[in-house]
């Protein structure tokens, strides 16, 4: 059997929608767990939409129009650490978590198109960051995400899940994050500093303004 088409995938799902075009909320699954941010009684899914005609272009799909066409700005407020091949930005536009840091290679690629040398270094960088994030007093666990539906250039999100706040465990962490009050930027900087230092120690490079305020 060949891998199925998206039309077949969609049709199988669409067969389960009710008269209002919605799938039922899976109360026996994660929506019913204690880590889910919303109460099931007041919840309904949005009407299911069919596949679009094409995948939309993402920001920086063309390398010439991507941020990586310009050198790293060492004065950038969001820059936490960088070296000759990688950079880490802090989420200064707002974070409800103790730390949210974006790791990107400076060479233009996505996860599926990484040059072998970039792929080889990625694991070690993620390990350094996760260890330093889990060393923060307000963090219980480091989480790692790769989405890439908005920007074409590879960016991995490392998040610090607040320590002992067990409701915030698992994949709903980002949904919680959107609803949490913002962490002050000076607190984000002091949490980012040990992570930037660990990166500089293990991978060279420089600590940026976001970890120095
Ligand atoms: Zn790029």
Residue ranges with predicted function:
Residues 105, 147-175:
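Histidine-centered divalent-metal-coordination microenvironment in nucleic-acid enzymes
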């Amino acid at each position: 059997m060949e891998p199925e088409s998206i039309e077949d995938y969609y049709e199988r799902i669409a067969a389960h929608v009710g008269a209002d075009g919605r799938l039922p909320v899976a109360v026996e699954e994660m929506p019913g767990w204690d880590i889910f941010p919303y109460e099931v009684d007041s919840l309904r899914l949005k009407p299911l939409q069919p596949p679009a005609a094409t995948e939309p272009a993402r920001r920086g799909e063309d390398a010439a129009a991507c941020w990586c066409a310009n050198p790293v700005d060492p004065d950038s407020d969001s820059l936490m650490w960088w070296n000759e091949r990688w950079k880490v930005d802090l989420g200064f536009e707002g974070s409800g978590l103790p730390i949210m840091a974006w790791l990107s290679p400076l060479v233009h690629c996505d996860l599926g198109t990484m040059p072998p040398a970039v792929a080889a270094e990625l694991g070690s960088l993620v390990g350094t960051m996760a260890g330093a994030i889990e060393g923060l007093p307000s963090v219980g666990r480091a989480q790692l995400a790769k989405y890439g539906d908005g920007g074409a250039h590879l960016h991995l999100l490392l998040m610090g899940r607040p320590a002992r706040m067990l409701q915030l465990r698992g994949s709903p962490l980002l949904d919680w994050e959107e609803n949490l009050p913002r962490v002050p930027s000076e607190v984000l900087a002091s949490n980012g500093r040990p992570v930037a230092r660990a990166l500089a120690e293990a991978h060279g490079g420089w600590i940026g303004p976001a970890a120095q305020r």
